Swiss-Prot record:
Residue numbers spanned by region Necessary for interaction with SART3: 27-216
Gene: Usp4
EC number annotated for this UniProt entry: 3.4.19.12
Name of the protein this chain belongs to: Ubiquitin carboxyl-terminal hydrolase 4
Segments of skewed composition (Acidic residues): 657-666, 952-962
Tissue: Expressed in brain, kidney, liver and spleen (at protein level).
Length: 962
């Protein structure tokens, strides 16, 4: 891809803004192509054209010119141009339709060597169609049947068909077009599934990240290499799938997909191959497995294979699997009589059936682990946000599963319309009973029986004191955590002393503080005055942003590389200094290009020069002094006859102090003159400058290491050149300079290793400030039930005042369910800041007494025991999910890490990773599910084994995150 084209093809900024603005609202259409652009380049373009009405400062000025499109910040490997993992839309990149991309490409070009990042729009959802751009393609492992060790990786869109894969594999393995082939999924060393429907898309086929596909060419005699293996694999005529060489009588293992096996398989999973029929569920209707469970496998201790960033799903499923009332409901096939296929809010019973089959497999006692591929496929059909292979939130998936199961199993076939009623002064008990009965008239399922409780919500108008009391059902409690007030930042301080390396510091600053707070904190550690600091965000060898002191720290994300420069506001003699950004560039010879033809490298500089001495010579010397630590000066015999000889500073259009500022409407015009040298002209700068020019004239000087260019703020486009006649340069605080090196000079005189070297301050090695002591779960509950005032953007409409009011609002708990799910709200974010609260929340493993938080004083005692925990390790958007769960059959705790299951002890469970807690209510009397459906809190629960004896030989487990 060529670099930027000439500016004559580029319309004025207003036209650009209008044309792109109209295109940015383009609706996503299936199969359409959209392009990724690095958000930093796009933000620079928006500033240049004044795209946002609130950011119109210096619109169209040359220093804001974005230069050619540069997506290098999105690549983990610049050679292969592979996208970094976990990129976030709008934060890391923007998506533009093809027409918008073509316009930008025509106007600005693209950095040399970069290919456009083009992606297709794919459609998700079975009933409600949802289009989205498929940013991350699916990686498949491809091999040929005769040489399974030669595996090639290829990327495909989920909208591609199986035929597309076959065509690519024929090409890769040199298989003639006339030769018949078959495609197989390879799940384990000996388990295969034939992909016979070539018109199926990858999404429909349920292929997942890293899936191995095998292409099998037909023998010349018309037989197939795998045919003999298939005939040996099974004797069951109704089943094309086996995971063992011996037949199985289990109808659960009989599915429609064609699978064969190469021999014995002890741990393979039937979940790989469950066929999905568009006209029905595609799952077996019962669980009457005749094959006895293994005596060595405890039912329920079944790991779940990671299908590609699906640890979040595995964690949620393990917690649900160990929720005894729900699991027993499915194992006893009670769900079959309650499936509601006609519920418009449901999923035709398919989520319930998929979940039932998975639970039966996990509790069969036959498998140490299974791959929940079909369950994930079913979830993705109805909830497109979970259909890909990017990390998701276990609590969000949990909420979808519970809601999906509820609607699929809702016993109410026709929901009545019910008018909501306010309390109007009636007793709470009356209003609560009415609200719960109305809820049950529309919602009656095992999920309601097991997980639903009742909130009391009280709103008070600040003007008329109107009190509104309502009661609403809930399925889980989302509890806020006390917010931390500080944040830890790691920054680099670049001292003014050129012989000092940059120093990395770790500082504590207010979470919602300003840049000035960062400078003050850094000043205390370094001894450098805060007023002499300039805070910058360095990205791709340039300043992405130079911050003002009053800007918020919320603009700085953990991903940013923050460099703080010590600058001189005044010189030694007290005169005012100007501080200029300076970039390093290696000049390339590109005479036909309107762009700079230069590549940025190294760490950018902020160079301070006295205004009254701002000549080219003094600027050159100031830069040389600033970089003296990592450059070598030329040898004495490397002289030039004059420091200002033509070509030394590629001067053309001079910039003089006192001249009227020139309008740079066409950068190309300036570019055409870069190689010319302007005459010295009239000396109107005074005797001092004339004398200075005479002083250096004729003196032998060292060979110049670099030349100067006045560039845009990205360093990607030349704007002007600098005067070579000793007169003062007309530069201001918005000017940006580049020092251009040729390749040979850079390799001879520039020390790359030393230029990147830095020191670490003691703050980096010292233990971080001890965090606040662990928070008790009761503190989170108290915070949840604390009265608050509604925000101005979230007011309440007062029926008495007839207007919206910032009322006070208070939540209370009225009744609690059998299974209490507690979601600890660890993730918080705003437009600029995304954070995870890693506070340790101390929650009881046994005897959590919630009675004191229930405002219904006539209610029974609410005492709970912990049964499962979903853990999250890492930061927001990345990391790894696991689970702790208590097996109901032996009363022991286990740690579930995808396919791995290991014994755990109670003292391992309470950690800062705990994210979702599952509690089961203690019941005074044993009651079965026949009591389900009564008022929450008034019924008993299913009494299960609750052995709390010693764990026995607990195993320490070291998590290996993916």
């Amino acid at each position: 891809m060529a670099e930027g084209r000439g500016s004559r093809e580029r319309p004025d900024v207003e036209t650009q803004k209008t044309e792109l603005g109209a295109l940015m609202g383009t609706t996503l259409q299936r199969g359409a192509q959209w392009y990724l652009i690095d958000s930093r380049w796009f933000k620079q373009w928006k500033k240049y054209v004044g795209f946002d009405s609130w950011d119109m400062y210096n619109v169209g000025e040359h220093n804001l010119f974005p230069g050619p499109i540069d997506n290098s910040g999105l690549f983990s490997d610049p050679e292969s141009q592979t996208l970094k993992e976990h990129l976030i839309d709008e934060l890391d990149y923007v998506l533009v339709p093809a027409e918008a991309w073509n316009k930008l490409l025509n106007w600005y070009g693209c950095v040399e060597g970069q290919q456009p990042i083009v992606r297709k729009v794919v459609e998700h959802g079975l009933f409600v169609k949802h289009c989205k751009v498929e940013v991350y393609l699916l990686e498949l492992k491809l091999c040929e049947n005769s040489d399974p060790t030669n595996v090639l990786s290829c990327h495909f869109s989920k909208a591609d068909t199986i035929a597309t894969i076959e065509k690519e594999m024929r090409k890769l393995f040199n298989i003639p077009a006339e030769r018949e082939t078959r495609l197989w999924n390879k799940y384990m060393s000996n388990t295969y599934e034939q992909l016979s429907k070539l018109d199926n898309t990858i999404q429909d086929a349920g292929l997942y990240q890293g899936q191995v596909l095998v292409i099998e060419p037909q023998n010349e005699d018309g037989t197939w290499p795998r045919q003999s293996l298939q005939s040996k694999s099974s004797t069951a005529p109704s089943r094309n799938f086996t995971t063992s060489s011996k037949p199985s009588a289990s109808p659960y293992c009989s599915v429609s997909a064609s699978l064969i096996a190469n021999g014995d398989s002890t741990n393979s999973s039937g979940m790989h191959s469950s066929g999905v029929s568009r006209g029905g569920s595609g799952f077996s209707a019962s669980y009457n497995c005749q094959e006895p469970p293994s005596p060595h496998i405890q039912p329920g201790l079944c790991g779940l294979g990671n299908l590609g960033n699906t640890c979040f799903m595995n964690s949620a499923l393990q917690c649900l699997s160990n929720t005894a009332p729900l699991t027993e409901y499915f194992l006893k096939d009670e769900y079959e009589a309650e499936i509601n296929r006609d519920n418009p809010l449901g999923m035709k019973g398919e989520i319930a059936e998929a979940y039932a089959e998975l639970i039966k497999q996990m509790w069969s006692g036959r498998d140490t682990h299974v791959a929940p591929r079909m369950f994930k496929t079913q979830v993705g059909r109805f909830a497109p946000q979970f259909s890909g292979y990017q990390q998701q939130d276990s609590q969000e998936l949990l909420a979808f599963i519970l809601d999906g199961l509820h609607e699929d199993l809702n016993r109410v076939k026709k929901k009545p319309y019910l008018e909501p009623k306010d309390a109007n002064g009636r007793p709470d008990a009356v209003v609560a009973k009415e609200a719960w009965e109305n809820h049950r008239l529309r919602n009656d399922s095992v999920i309601v029986d097991t997980f639903h409780g009742l909130f009391k919500s009280t709103l008070v108008c600040p003007e008329c004191a109107k009190v509104s009391v309502t009661f609403d059902p809930f399925c889980y409690l989302t509890l806020p955590l006390p917010l931390k007030k500080d944040r830890i930042m790691e920054v680099f301080l670049v001292p003014a002393d050129p012989q000092c390396r940059p120093i990395q510091y770790r500082v504590t600053v207010p979470l919602m503080g300003a840049i000035s707070d960062l400078c003050e904190a850094l000043s205390k550690l370094s001894g450098i005055a805060a007023e002499n600091m300039v805070v910058t965000d360095v990205y791709n060898h340039r300043f992405h942003k130079i911050f003002q002191m009053d800007e918020g720290l919320s603009h700085i994300t953990p991903r940013d590389d923050i460099f703080v420069y010590e600058v001189c506001n005044t010189s030694m003699d007290g005169s005012e200094c100007i501080t200029l950004p300076v970039y390093f560039r290696e000049k390339k010879s590109r005479p036909s290009s309107a762009s700079s033809g230069a590549v940025l490298y190294g760490q950018p500089l902020l160079v301070s020069v006295p205004k009254h001495k701002l000549t080219l010579e003094s600027l050159y010397q100031a830069v040389c002094d600033r970089i003296s630590r990592y450059i070598k000066q030329p040898l004495p015999d490397e002289f030039l006859s004059s420091p200002l000889e033509p070509g030394a500073c590629n001067g053309s259009r001079s910039s003089y102090e006192g001249d009227e500022e020139e309008e740079m409407d066409h950068q190309e015009e300036g570019k055409e003159q870069l190689s010319e040298v302007e005459g010295s002209g009239e000396d109107d700068q005074g005797d001092d400058h004339s004398e200075s020019a005479q002083k250096v004239k004729g003196q032998p000087r060292h060979k110049r290491l670099f030349t100067f260019s006045l560039v845009n703020s990205c360093g990607t486009a030349d704007i002007n050149s600098l005067a070579t006649d000793g007169k003062l340069l007309k530069l201001n605080s918005r000017s940006t300079l580049a020092i251009d090196w040729d390749s040979e000079t850079r390799s001879l005189y520039f020390d790359e290793q030393e230029s990147e070297a830095c020191e670490k301050h003691l703050s980096m090695s010292q233990p971080q400030k001890k965090k606040k002591a662990a928070v008790a779960l009761r503190e989170c509950i108290e915070l949840f039930t604390t009265m608050e005032t509604l925000g101005e953007h979230d007011p309440w409409y007062c029926p008495t005042c007839k207007k919206h009011q910032q009322a006070t609002k208070k939540f209370d708990l009225w009744s609690l369910p059998k299974i209490l799910v507690v979601h600890l709200k660890r993730f918080s974010y705003n437009r600029y800041w995304r954070d995870k609260l890693d506070t340790v929340v101390e929650f009881p493993v046994r005897a959590l007494n919630m009675s004191e938080f229930v405002c219904d004083r006539s209610a029974r005692p609410y005492v709970y025991d912990l049964i499962a925990v979903s853990n999250h390790y890492g930061a927001m958007g990345v990391g790894h999910y696991t689970a702790y769960a208590k097996n109901r059959l032996n009363g022991k705790w286990y740690y579930f890490d995808d396919s791995s299951v290991s014994l755990a002890s109670e003292d391992q469970i309470v950690t800062k990773a705990a994210y979702v807690l599952f509690y089961q209510r203690r019941d005074d009397e044993c009651s079965s599910t026949s009591s389900l459906g009564s008022f929450p809190g008034s019924d008993g629960g299913v009494k299960l084994s609750s052995s709390h004896q010693g764990m026995g030989d607990e195993e320490a487990y070291n998590m290996d995150t993916n």
